[in-house]
Amino acid sequence: MALSRLSSRSNTFLKPAITALPSSIRRHVSTDSSPITIETAVPFTSHLCESPSRSVETSSEEILAFFRDMARMRRMEIAADSLYKAKLIRGFCHLYDGQEALAVGMEAAITKKDAIITSYRDHCTFIGRGGKLVDAFSELMGRKTGCSHGKGGSMHFYKKDASFYGGHGIVGAQIPLGCGLAFAQKYNKDEAVTFALYGDGAANQGQLFEALNISALWDLPAILVCENNHYGMGTATWRSAKSPAYFKRGDYVPGLKVDGMDALAVKQACKFAKEHALKNGPIILEMDTYRYHGHSMSDPGSTYRTRDEISGVRQVRDPIERVRKLLLTHDIATEKELKDMEKEIRKEVDDAVAQAKESPIPDASELFTNMYVKDCGVESFGADRKELKVTLP
């Protein structure tokens, strides 16, 4: 009965994209950097604020970069799937395929001075912030050269030099941390904002409302981004939320609902949100998106939703295919050029995997690095408590 009810709701995922396929484009000149105006077919829905313009200014160069970056992210996640099944990745692993438009669209609207903090589904956000594939794969496999020195794993990617403050494993716990980052930005007069990303499952957490309250009270430059992929683990939004209009959850805080599988719509929304947050304080962005994999690698992803639903979203809403259509329809690239690019990306990912496999395992001393105060004299023993493994200085 639950499945039949869920199946009847599958059209919810398809409606925005069916409307979104036709887009009107005006090309001013034919050079790569020349401006192109694309009008999104899916309108933004706003709460307590004006909606941004649906006319998005871009360029053929940017659209091509969107395709390349999303294709790289997709291939990385596919490779991670294989590595996990080969038992080269241990523990938790949450994949982002299907949601790539969020990572690239957001980056197109902000700078590295702006901070991002997210949940455990963080691989592509790390790459979007300028992270290297080899650093990602090294971290996934627990190697010394990983972005968190092999100690974070899938859920705890990190890149401080690009203002990426992680991957966090506790549902919703990153939201107050993100608002704290926004407080620091305001205190230091940085003229920057923080994007705190969370899923629809975390949208029901009490700490979200507490952080939102203080952010609004102090007019912090915090942008709370709900990545609504419609399932919190295996629980559909209609089962967990009385009001699944997450962009309205702030009540007194403005919000915007966005087609999260359209990279250009995401870019426009994030640009609008940044301008708003710097002047007026927090805003909520609800990104309507979809994940192709299950919640994690232990979840087949097909027990609480139908395979027809998944394939239906792929056919009409896939973020990469939508950009591919733009590139082909408007003669920005040929089919062969795009296939060649995908072939190069596949090799790039394969090379990164091979290089990461050669990276050494962290030293035993890394178990306590960044954990305890230096010179505290903590000792580490083997499982039998007999053999001394490492003594901290």
UniProtKB/Swiss-Prot annotation:
This is Pyruvate dehydrogenase E1 component subunit alpha-2, mitochondrial. Residues 1-28 form a transit peptide. E1 activity is regulated by phosphorylation (inactivation) and dephosphorylation (activation) of the alpha subunit. It is an enzyme of class 1 (oxidoreductase). Its main location: mitochondrion. Mg(2+) binds at residues 200, 229, 231. It catalyses: N(6)-[(R)-lipoyl]-L-lysyl-[protein] + pyruvate + H(+) = N(6)-[(R)-S(8)-acetyldihydrolipoyl]-L-lysyl-[protein] + CO2. The pyruvate dehydrogenase complex catalyzes the overall conversion of pyruvate to acetyl-CoA and CO(2). It contains multiple copies of three enzymatic components: pyruvate dehydrogenase (E1), dihydrolipoamide acetyltransferase (E2) and lipoamide dehydrogenase (E3). Disruption phenotype: Reduced sensitivity to several IAA-amino acid conjugates. GO terms for molecular function: cobalt ion binding; pyruvate dehydrogenase (acetyl-transferring) activity; zinc ion binding. The gene is IAR4. Its cofactor is thiamine diphosphate; Mg(2+). It is found in: Mitochondrion matrix. It comes from Arabidopsis thaliana. Keywords: Magnesium, Metal-binding, Mitochondrion, Oxidoreductase, Pyruvate, Thiamine pyrophosphate, Transit peptide. Tetramer of 2 alpha and 2 beta subunits. Gene3D superfamilies: 3.40.50.970. The keyword Acetylation does not apply.
